[in-house]
Amino acid sequence: MGKVRLLVQRRGRGSPTFRSPTHRAAGKVKIPTFDGDLVKGKVVALIKDSIHYAPLMVVKWENGAQSLLPAPLGISVGDTVYYGKEAPNAIGSIKPLSEIPEGTKIYMLENNPGDGGKLVRASGDFALLVQKLGDKVIVQLPSGQFKTLSANARAVIGVIAGGGRKEKPFVKAGNKYYWASSRNRHWPVVNGVKKNASDHPFGGKRHSNHSKPFTVSKWAPPGRKVGYIGARKTGRGK
């Protein structure tokens, strides 16, 4: 019989067990690109899938296109959203950063103009437009970090809905199990000392304490590299 590989070895192989199930997504969530300074759209649906933490809004534009975007707080089905330089400064409007007033809460920021929005996409998140400096704009991200972006990069005005998601506890292990299964998360996480000797270097019941030191060389083979890898020191600092 073959040896049972460690969890870190199995995860590193990248089997479907550990991959994000992107095929369960409702669609591609990105800022669309249209010609013209003002394009109107209508929110036709609010949906939720197992991939994105934030609720999504389905927008039907007047040119016939349809897009999927994180829903801002306060939006509802039937509301009108706008796209372009001449769009009003209303919730859900998509505008270049150069056309958005300073101090506005925004989300779905483009890291590079035209990339569709790569920053600030999680539920409850928003960034602040702090200052405009010619062709550059300074924004404050949810982490507190200040980032300089191109003034031609686009963003959506508002705060992403679903900010209280973490306030509701799982309560039962079954709820946590189904949540983890929907995202291919490995759960529950078991301590190596509690495992069998064949499953982990620290496992087994022959000794009351672990039979190997927690510190391990960074040159150790993959099946042994668990614990404090290449640690210079352990424990509390004096």
Swiss-Prot record:
Belongs to the universal ribosomal protein uL2 family. PANTHER family: LARGE RIBOSOMAL SUBUNIT PROTEIN UL2 (PTHR13691:SF16), RIBOSOMAL PROTEIN L2 (PTHR13691). GO terms for biological process: cytoplasmic translation. HAMAP family: Ribosomal_uL2_A. One of the primary rRNA binding proteins. Required for association of the 30S and 50S subunits to form the 70S ribosome, for tRNA binding and peptide bond formation. It has been suggested to have peptidyltransferase activity; this is somewhat controversial. Makes several contacts with the 16S rRNA in the 70S ribosome. GO terms for molecular function: rRNA binding; structural constituent of ribosome. Gene3D superfamilies: 2.30.30.30, Nucleic acid-binding proteins, Ribosomal protein L2, domain 3. InterPro entries: NA-bd_OB-fold, Rib_uL2_dom2, Ribosomal_uL2, Ribosomal_uL2_arc_euk, Ribosomal_uL2_C, Ribosomal_uL2_dom3, Ribosomal_uL2_RNA-bd_dom, Translation_prot_SH3-like_sf. Pfam families: Ribosomal_L2 (PF00181), Ribosomal_L2_C (PF03947). This is Large ribosomal subunit protein uL2. Residues 197-219 are annotated as: Disordered.
